[in-house]
Design a protein with these regions (language model features):
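Phosphate-binding P-loop
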Residues: 2-7
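N-terminal phosphate/diphosphate-binding loop that engages ATP/GTP or pyrophosphate donors
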Residues: 21-71
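NTP-dependent small-molecule kinase module
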Residues: 118, 134, 138-142, 156-194
Length: 194
């Protein structure tokens, strides 16, 4: 059953290297009425970061308590730190009817959809595998085996992308951002679930 306000929830996902963060940043820059969830993390605050703006900074104990109490809707562990989405962050947007984007890994997207069937999942595709490989290499930070692993994972994720409500191809960032914007506009214009 859909909770009221679930139509304001948008999950953007896709393989590593598709540029989903860049596309969402572009979208938020052009359309300030749309927001993005602020993730919770246990990593140390960096200089210039603001608690509650860049991240909600939690201790490992706080994060694990929130997790145990069901107050974190999806999370991942990266470089020995937790990153996750707070339930309160999602619910606030639903209550206030503010369209909100969660940019998350493919594995986390299914969890959100199960929790909020009224949410919209959007899969960001690379133009093709060659381009994805080029983008992963362009970063110049990863070892060859890491790149190969990510490409294999991307193929698996793309193969499973049929489960998503919407698909967009990130060829030109601006175009892709506007495509997502029109998906959001169309969805929030639909009548509320009773």
């Amino acid at each position: 059953s859909c909770m009221k306000g679930e139509k304001y929830l948008f999950v953007v996902s896709g393989p590593s290297g598709t540029g989903k963060d860049t596309v969402v940043a572009k979208l938020l820059g052009s359309h300030p009425e749309i927001e993005k969830t602020v993730s919770a993390t246990t990593r140390t605050m960096r200089e210039g970061e603001v608690n509650g703006k860049n991240y909600h900074f939690l201790t490992k104990e706080q994060f694990e308590t929130a997790l145990a109490e069901g107050n974190i809707v999806e999370h991942t562990c990266y470089c020995e730190n937790y990153y996750g989405t707070l339930r309160s962050e999602v619910e606030r947007h639903m209550e206030q009817q503010i369209p909100v984007i969660l940019v998350i890994e493919v594995e986390g997207a299914g969890n959100i959809k199960r929790m909020s069937p009224g949410s919209t999942t959007i899969f960001v595709m690379p133009p093709d595998m060659k381009e994805l490989e080029r983008r992963l290499r362009y970063r110049g930070t990863e070892a060859e085996e890491v790149i190969q692993k990510r490409l294999r994972r991307a193929e698996t994720e793309i193969a499973r992308s049929a489960d998503y409500d919407e698909h967009v191809v990130n060829d030109v960032v601006d175009t892709c951002a506007e495509e997502i914007y029109s998906i959001i506009q169309k969805r929030i214009a639909e009548p509320d679930a009773e």
